[in-house]
């Protein structure tokens, strides 16, 4: 969130108005205004691009990648993840039931154990 952008990008209210389906292209075209680490602006670009890296590296969407590594181990049977044009939206949009969210929260509180 501190990598130099002037304003939030890929935010929920903005996404329906993008004319370009390639959100990686949109994200990489955003100019940097500040030096990285010097200015905080909440945005979805960094987490979105991190999700893209996982998807490209392993050749599958985020749910397919994380199910055997995380979700099934936590007993989360059918997670749903919001999609963007062309891929999963790694910056947000993970839909879990309340009990699944509880399991995830306990996993986090127990530092991955």
Spans of model-derived segments:
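Active-site-adjacent helix/loop patches that line small-molecule binding or acyl-intermediate pockets
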Residues: 1-76, 98-102, 106-112
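A beta-strand-loop signature enriched in Asp, Gly, Thr, and Trp
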Residues: 81-89, 111-113
